Amino acid sequence: MYSLARPFLFSLDAERAHGLGLSALDLAYRTGTTPLLAARIAPMPSTVFGLTFPNPVGLAAGLDKNGEHIDALFALGFGFVEIGTITPRPQAGNPQPRLFRLPEHNAIINRMGFNNAGVDALVRNVERARNRRGLLGINIGKNKDTPNEQAVDDYIACLDKVYPLADYITVNISSPNTAGLRELQEETALRQLVSQLRDRQEDLAARHGRRVPMLVKVAPDLSDRDIDAAARVLGELQVDGVIATNTTIDHSKVAGDPLANEAGGLSGAPVLEQSTLVLRRLRSRLPESVPLVGVGGILSGADAVAKMAAGAALVQCYSGLIFRGPALVSECVEAIRRRREAPSRGAVAPL
């Protein structure tokens, strides 16, 4: 079914196609026709962060920024769906055009800039969702006009409001499309930010009688030294998990494409290798008690298995969904299922 719709969607402006595609998913969900788009997936429970996921394949943040399509996205078979990135106040993001497909490379460049309706709107949308078939992650960020020195206030504002509704929360400090945001990954800034968020997390756990795991999402463009420093900080602060990785600012893998010089983060097939290298190095540096979520360049079941072999406990896709359609979800789940049945093939490769 998606193979029939894709040529039409790809004939449209990428951001318009994004909205139209989500509307179509909502319609399919309401009319009970989602099975025409996505195969039924047998359960494959995976316990990570103390949570049991129906299966280990999730949707990465960015597709549903405001949590408006939760039920429809779960109907595609994802074991978990991550919504956001959300900020305390609504913001328009960067000027359009800001989303570009590179079909020859199975890649996307985006410079969206955390466009979203604000955390209060997301909370209302999550409260309206009625059929959460998996676990819900909420990805939080800071407003563009909030200086890094005050970034913790934005993250705490979001953390407080989404905590009662989320199964887990992701702290996004790695988008390349908010000026200066990635500076929060520097060792001193990272320690200062995450230590305050960890304190708030424990306060909220006591207040709500429920501990919601908090993850940190990192960039693929970190040097080995920066990766090691981040692992040291995040391990010492006992974060619940790390998502590796966000989009890359390195466009060398798409050099020569007419859109290669568009500013923004590159995702899709060209980021697979580098994001997996970062994942593998983090796994070797972090305590085993800190699970990893592998994301970046998953366009096949084999790609998902490669992430697991590099040390991921869960995987996420986004760009792959755009190029492959909903069939990618079941393909990834079944590939991981086969790997579980033959675990000798899943040893973490050395650096």
Curated annotation (Swiss-Prot):
CDD domains in UniProt: DHOD_2_like
Membrane topology: Peripheral membrane protein
Reactions performed catalytically: (S)-dihydroorotate + a quinone = orotate + a quinol
Cofactor remark: Binds 1 FMN per subunit.
Gene Ontology MF term list: dihydroorotate dehydrogenase (quinone) activity
EC main group: oxidoreductase
NCBIfam families in alphabetical order: PRK05286.1-1, PRK05286.1-2, PRK05286.1-4, PRK05286.2-5, pyrD_sub2
Family, similarity comment: Belongs to the dihydroorotate dehydrogenase family. Type 2 subfamily.
Protein's recorded name: Dihydroorotate dehydrogenase (quinone)
Species, as recorded: Stenotrophomonas maltophilia (strain K279a)
Name of the gene this protein is made from: pyrD
